Regions:
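Flexible, P/S/T/G-rich "lid" or insertion loops adjacent to the active sites of thioester-utilizing
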Residues: 1-22
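Acyl-thioester-dependent acyl-group transfer interface
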Residues: 5, 36-224
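Short amphipathic alpha-helical segments
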Residues: 24-33
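Generic structural signal for individual residues within well-ordered alpha-helical segments
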Residues: 14, 28-29, 86
């Protein structure tokens, strides 16, 4: 497992998002897709993201996990720029994050988890069955992107710790990379856990981001 850390200014990401009329989350997903085209050597990148469904389920303060996951993809070529792909990506994200869509997706995914858990089988068998469900449902992707922390509470100990600690997140079965984005003091930190064997991810992310005028403060492969 390779680890990569990238730090960029939040304002530069917000500026690119505003220029293209999309959310910063979508701009970040688009930037990562451009970088991974070079890194993975693929012209179509699949990405997944999760959404909190506690509010839609009527339990906004619940302490347990209450999420649903979505997957989408983007086709790229060597001339593709961020502005070419993010409008459609943003429309897809907004469509999936409607309350009805989130509840429907959560119900489908959690019903599968419940059915697997009810099986009278060893844990290793349940894990394999659950992995099969991930493949069947289309959840595996080239990268998973998620956000940690409440941006209105930027100084929480959990968030401060995570900018230095990768042990919270690993890629799911079928996913090449897990990307956790945290925002603290105007800096977005990407902690990336990568199953792919090729070196050089940090440099390719820096190149792709800076080509789109993102201010990259750090891009380093930690396991070289």
């Amino acid at each position: 497992m390779r680890r990569t850390r990238v730090r960029l200014t939040k304002q530069s990401l917000v500026d690119r998002a505003v220029e293209n009329g999309v959310k910063p989350f979508t701009a970040l997903a688009g930037l990562l897709s451009l970088a991974l085209r070079s890194y993975l050597g693929k012209d179509e990148i699949q990405y997944s993201y999760s959404a909190d469904t506690r509010r839609e389920a009527g339990v906004p303060d619940a302490l347990y996990n209450c999420v649903c996951s979505f997957q989408s993809g983007v086709k790229l070529n060597e001339d593709t720029r961020l502005a070419d792909i993010v409008p459609e990506m943003d429309a897809e994200v907004l469509r999936t994050l409607q309350p009805e869509a989130k509840l429907r997706q959560m119900a489908q995914q959690m019903s599968w988890v419940y059915k697997v858990d009810r099986q009278k089988a060893p844990l290793r068998i349940k894990q394999r069955v659950f992995q099969m469900g991930e493949y069947i449902s289309g959840v595996p992707a080239d990268f998973w992107l998620s956000y940690l922390g409440n941006p209105l509470l930027p100084a929480t100990p959990e968030l401060q710790k995570y900018t230095k600690d990768f042990n919270v997140w690993v890629p799911p079965d079928g996913g090449s990379m897990g990307v956790e984005a945290s925002s603290l003091n105007g800096i977005i930190t990407l902690c990336i856990e990568n199953k792919a064997e090729m070196p050089g991810l940090a440099g390719m992310i820096r190149t792709a981001f800076e080509k789109e005028d993102i201010t990259v403060l750090e891009a380093v492969d930690l396991d070289t």
